């Protein structure tokens, strides 16, 4: 029978000092011997997705203590990718994932916690905590802050839905008046919560449901809705159940590595492809899999991308649907239910909400469940009132959206497309693969041949786009922005937004060893691996080169001869210490970022640390 980890610091005369300190935190005499549950919160006033989380730890703690545990809360950092975007701050976003992961490990192991509740929400916080949870392999449950309500405003006598990307595009589009741009800006992000489309934060929170690590509704229930309160309370109760199962009954199925196993990662990626999730999820799932010692790779993602249809289309891929609409249609459980009926998921996977995913779907999939409480749960809707407060409204749709033919979530035979929402491309320019969010690409652009317009940084690319250098038919190449080369693998939302603002969103392609915001749409191909700084072919592309992209064939090719490519590689290597470095780029890189770059791997490995460099 596993012994409580916390006994290390609470039992025995030699731990008198530790117990004295525990007492100073509020632990009572009769508390010693109870499991200590760590609550990793990520409250910050910098991020709208986290601004309302301050009191969430107390909610979870109360439920834990009622169930017989000791709850101890700590905080992690949280970077807002939208605020950090478009300047040097974005260099810190992806590296913060590793910092969050390490900080959770440090706190949990330093204090010998027995189990963990992760209160996350935005882009790097959920994956960072997930990496830590799988590294630690103690009972865990995730509960996020929830999505933001979609923005709404009236323009040209028409009510339209909005999100962050609309504000960015309008702000860069000279055709939009100052008045309209300001109106869009003021309306785009009306409430607390993670940005309202299927961007990275919401994608990752949805994937925790498919991995079996969070409760139904975690990814879709609005941050503002009163019903979300119960998710936090239930998370506290469930973590105590998982803790009891493991420590008192030696039930290893309660551990995250047995829940989030290979089949669960396949389920998560299948969901991601079906809902057209952010391409960043690929990066984070690969990283989490490595922490959990799960052999899940780009090859598995490529295989699944050829099998899974696109069942749910959400902003930024369409202006019609946002996360509030996904929730009304049954949320993640609704999508998983359709995938299950299509025979595309492993329904025997363990899940924190029940014995198996099949059991969970029987209750929570509105297409098969007649439970009135479940239908009421998914009827929770927006209020349309600006607020930074959680649980501030209790509005409901008149009915759930159970239309699986023409609704937000569809049956396989009525899918938005039989091709899924994400695809892996490979070729001589990306030998180890790259990622495109096909959900956001017009079908007319699934094959594209263009002339390379090469930039050594995102800043130069932005200047080139806004300065008129980029024209229809160009393939914008932004390199040396990978995990090592940036360092930090910046998101390229501004270049893609500016292409749209110049009317080039469907007339150009963009490829990069950097990554894209979940808000990106258009023919935007990221995660090119190996990256330029690691000797990847993208570092050898020259302006004017012909680049051929074929999504149906899963191909991306630099159309030069092998002889010419070899000659360019030799010339690059001859540059000595300056080889595989951006020519003429001036960028201030802090010591912290340099340390990150030393161990960073390319995107096909999840941009995790190269641990071989740490071996004796």
UniProtKB/Swiss-Prot annotation:
Q: What class of enzyme is it?
A: lyase
The pathway that the record names for this protein is: Amino-acid biosynthesis; L-isoleucine biosynthesis; L-isoleucine from 2-oxobutanoate: step 3/4; Amino-acid biosynthesis; L-valine biosynthesis; L-valine from pyruvate: step 3/4
Cited Gene3D superfamilies: IlvD/EDD C-terminal domain-like
- Cross-referenced Pfam families, in alphabetical order? ILV_EDD_C, ILVD_EDD_N
According to the lineage, what is the superkingdom?
Bacteria
N6-carboxylysine modifications at? 124
Keyword Metal-binding (UniProt): yes
Catalysed reactions listed for this entry: (2R)-2,3-dihydroxy-3-methylbutanoate = 3-methyl-2-oxobutanoate + H2O; (2R,3R)-2,3-dihydroxy-3-methylpentanoate = (S)-3-methyl-2-oxopentanoate + H2O
Alphabetical UniProt keywords: 2Fe-2S, Amino-acid biosynthesis, Branched-chain amino acid biosynthesis, Iron, Iron-sulfur, Lyase, Magnesium, Metal-binding
For the ligand (Mg(2+)), the binding residues are 81, 123-124, 491
Q: Cofactor binding mode, per the note?
A: Binds 1 [2Fe-2S] cluster per subunit. This cluster acts as a Lewis acid cofactor.
The residues responsible for catalysis, as annotated, are 517 (proton acceptor)
> Where [2Fe-2S] cluster is bound, by residue?
122, 195
Which cofactor is recorded for it? [2Fe-2S] cluster; Mg(2+)
Q: Which GO terms describe its cellular component?
A: cytosol
Q: Name one GO biological process term.
A: L-valine biosynthetic process
> What terms describe the molecular function in GO for this protein?
2 iron, 2 sulfur cluster binding; dihydroxy-acid dehydratase activity; magnesium ion binding
Name the EC number(s): 4.2.1.9
* Subunit annotation: Homodimer.
Function as written in the Swiss-Prot or TrEMBL entry: Functions in the biosynthesis of branched-chain amino acids. Catalyzes the dehydration of (2R,3R)-2,3-dihydroxy-3-methylpentanoate (2,3-dihydroxy-3-methylvalerate) into 2-oxo-3-methylpentanoate (2-oxo-3-methylvalerate) and of (2R)-2,3-dihydroxy-3-methylbutanoate (2,3-dihydroxyisovalerate) into 2-oxo-3-methylbutanoate (2-oxoisovalerate), the penultimate precursor to L-isoleucine and L-valine, respectively.
* Family of the protein in this entry: Belongs to the IlvD/Edd family.
Give the protein name, as stated in the record: Dihydroxy-acid dehydratase
Specify the species. Answer: Shewanella sediminis (strain HAW-EB3)
Taxonomic lineage is:
Bacteria, Pseudomonadati, Pseudomonadota, Gammaproteobacteria, Alteromonadales
């Amino acid at each position: 029978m596993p012994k409580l980890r916390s006994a290390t610091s609470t039992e025995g005369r030699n731990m008198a000092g530790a117990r004295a300190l525990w007492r100073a935190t509020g632990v009572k005499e009769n508390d010693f011997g109870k499991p200590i549950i760590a609550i990793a919160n990520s409250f910050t006033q910098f991020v709208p997705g986290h601004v309302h989380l301050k009191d969430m730890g107390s909610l979870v703690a109360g439920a834990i203590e009622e169930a017989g545990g000791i709850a101890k809360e700590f905080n992690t950092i949280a970077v807002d990718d939208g605020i950090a975007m478009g300047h040097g701050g974005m260099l810190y976003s992806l590296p913060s994932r590793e910092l969050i992961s390490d900080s959770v490990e440090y706190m949990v192991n330093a204090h010998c916690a027995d189990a963990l509740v992760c209160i996350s929400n935005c882009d790097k916080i959920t994956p960072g905590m997930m990496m830590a949870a799988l590294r630690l392999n103690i009972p865990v449950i995730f509960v996020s802050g929830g999505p933001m309500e979609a923005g709404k405003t009236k323009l040209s006598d028409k009510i339209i839905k909005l999100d962050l990307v609309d504000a960015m595009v309008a702000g860069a589009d000279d055709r939009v008046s100052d008045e309209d741009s300001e109106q869009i800006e003021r309306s785009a992000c009306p409430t607390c919560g993670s940005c309202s489309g299927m961007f990275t934060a919401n994608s990752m929170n949805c994937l925790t449901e498919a991995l079996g690590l969070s409760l139904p509704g975690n990814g879709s229930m609005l941050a503002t809705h009163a019903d979300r309160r119960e998710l936090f309370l239930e998370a506290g109760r469930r973590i105590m159940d998982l803790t009891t199962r493991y420590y008192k009954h030696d039930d290893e199925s309660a551990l995250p590595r047995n829940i989030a196993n290979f089949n669960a990662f396949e389920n998560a990626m299948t969901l991601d492809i079906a809902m057209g999730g952010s391409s960043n999820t690929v990066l984070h799932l690969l990283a989490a899999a490595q922490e959990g010692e799960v052999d899940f790779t780009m090859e598995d993602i490529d295989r699944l991308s050829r099998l899974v249809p696109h069942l749910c289309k959400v902003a930024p891929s369409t202006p019609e649907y946002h996360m509030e609409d996904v929730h009304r249609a049954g949320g993640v459980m609704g999508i998983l239910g359709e995938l299950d009926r299509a025979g595309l998921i492993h329904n025997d996977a363990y899940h924190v909400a029940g014995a198996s995913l099949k059991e969970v779907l029987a209750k929570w999939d509105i297409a098969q469940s007649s439970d009135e409480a479940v239908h009421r749960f998914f009827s929770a809707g927006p209020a349309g009132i600006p607020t930074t407060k959680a649980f501030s409204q209790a509005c409901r749709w008149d009915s759930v959206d159970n239309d699986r033919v023409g609704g937000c979530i569809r049956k396989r035979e009525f899918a938005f497309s039989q091709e899924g929402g994400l695809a892996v491309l490979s070729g001589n320019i990306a030998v180890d693969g790259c990622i495109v969010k096909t959900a956001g690409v017009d079908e007319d652009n699934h094959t594209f041949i263009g002339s390379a317009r090469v930039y050594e940084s995102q800043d130069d690319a932005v200047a080139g786009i806004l300065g008129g250098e980029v024209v229809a038919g160009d393939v914008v190449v932004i390199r040396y922005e990978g995990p090592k080369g940036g360092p930090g693998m910046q998101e390229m939302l501004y270049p893609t937004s500016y292409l749209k603002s110049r009317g080039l969103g469907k007339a150009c392609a963009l490829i990069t060893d950097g990554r894209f915001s979940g808000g990106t749409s258009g023919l935007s191909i990221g995660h090119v691996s190996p990256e330029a700084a690691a000797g990847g072919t993208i570092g050898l592309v020259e302006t004017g080169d012909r680049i051929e992209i074929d999504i149906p064939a899963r191909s991306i090719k630099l159309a030069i001869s092998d002889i010419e490519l070899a000659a360019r590689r030799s010339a690059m290597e001859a540059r000595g210490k300056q080889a595989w470095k951006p020519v003429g780029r001036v960028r201030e890189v802090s010591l912290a970022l340099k340390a990150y770059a030393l161990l960073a791997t390319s995107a096909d490995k999840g941009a995790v640390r190269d641990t071989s460099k740490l071996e004796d």
